[in-house]
Amino acid sequence: MASVILDEQLYDEDFVLNHTSLPFLVDVATGKLVRDHAEDPDAEVPETGEQNPFFVWDTATNAKAAYDVAAVKPALEGTFDVDGASCTTVFSLLKQKQVEYTPEWAESVSGVPAATIRQLAREYAEGPACLALGWGGNDKMGNADIAGHAAATLVALTGNVGKVGAGVGVFVGGSYNGHAGTLGAWELPEDMTAGTLEMPLYDAREGNAKVRACIFCGDVLQQHIGNMNKTAEFARGLDFIVTIDPYFTEGAKWADVILPATTRFENDAEVGSVKIGYSNIVLQNKIIEPLFEARTDFWIGKEIAKRFGKDQYLPATSEGWVAKVLSSSEDPYVSALTIDKINAANGVYPLEGIEEPRREFMDRVFATPSTRMDVYYDALVEYGQALPAYEPPLEAHAGNKLAETYPLQLANVHTLYRIHNQFNDAKWIQQFAEPRIELNPSEMEKRGLATGDAVEVFNDRGSFKCRVKANESIRPGSARMFEGQTADFLIEGNVQNVTNDGYVERGAELMCGPVIPFSDTLVEIKKA
């Protein structure tokens, strides 16, 4: 799509020049953006464009100029001598890179007809506006960051953001279109600040960590990492495991000590917590007493602190903590609230200004060092991803020889019957949602399978057994399983026994760390 927009000059030139990094100069030799001075690699916060300007080529003076000077007329493309170095623009580099990515090439990779790609590109660019929602599925593929980068580049070219009817990204119940507020905090002594992990858990499994004990909140061992067999080996080598969870999950089975936690509906106090979300301030009001031996997160935290002789620094009650984080907010609207005032509104108090829908980026100011929409990531130059460059998934692609042995891509998808692995054990839901793997009927026929058959799903990592179901909406070459399926509800084994745990090297440079590629997994299926 980007290639069509560039080739047919369908881009929004005003938006590109004035609100993106596409006219910024790049040193051809290093691939780095031209700045006023070298950045400090140890700086905790990147310098702003005001502190360390980016540069463009000013066509009026035929010289480099700071990007944010009002009188500058930046060149969109070209190659220039800048202080003895050959420099070009991000836009020029993008055009060069996109030459190989024709609609015909995209058809060969994706199966989407080239004519459809051209039509979609033209409709997206010519608008007048487009709201592009979704993107949630490919976050389980090894190359997911490239897809997100490419989407941002399309937006930068067309200006499909910051105007009525336009936007891009994952629509998650008000995260981006909702209003926000800021709670205060309970002050703690300096020696009670959070420590720093030696390394993330997915790296600790490789055997290089010093960690001997783990405290897990929720089903971290099964839900957060692929390849459960490797995770199990790591867990066996630990001296001590504690799991805090309302549910008896796969991770809980590995625990030496289980601290049963309450759900959001149970509390030993009238008010347990307070959150801001979905344009409202919401109290966690008590619905029922804690069941059985379950305890609240607040109680568990206090008891752990007591063992270290630090409980005196924590609030005496959860109501006291809630009152404090409200009153200490730097937002006057929030700090004026009390528990009684919020409960007078049935525990859900609207944030200020929610009568007007929140429209993001209407001022075309972005949360980047330059305050522009940044599509050139020079921190990823060494990985060849300063601009989005296609690379196949880690495992699930046609060019992988492994596909000759394991020809099906296993996709982990959401279901309306559960929230991840929560409610797995709800008996009345189980009658509608027996764990099954779904295949296209053509794949069923190849394997001599019928709906309801018990099958084994396997690869060189491991296997599990469940029942199979035909589904014409599943593409040939694919298999679908609702995520969060655990061993207690399968015939045998665990879905995570087969899932991919690899990740790309550049993952450490990404804002949220590497992608865990659960759906970037190849399997074969046979009758059990």
Give short role names for the model-derived ranges.
Residues 141, 287, 297-342, 423, ...:
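Long, contiguous, secondary-structure-rich segments that constitute the structural scaffold
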Residues 10-15, 117, 131-132, 160-170, ...:
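Acidic/polar loop patches that form or flank catalytic/metal-binding clefts of enzymes
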Residues 105-113, 135-142, 174-175, 219-222:
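Conserved short loop/turn motifs at secondary-structure junctions
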Residues 70-81, 90-93, 108, 151-254, ...:
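Extended redox/cofactor-interaction regions of prokaryotic respiratory oxidoreductases
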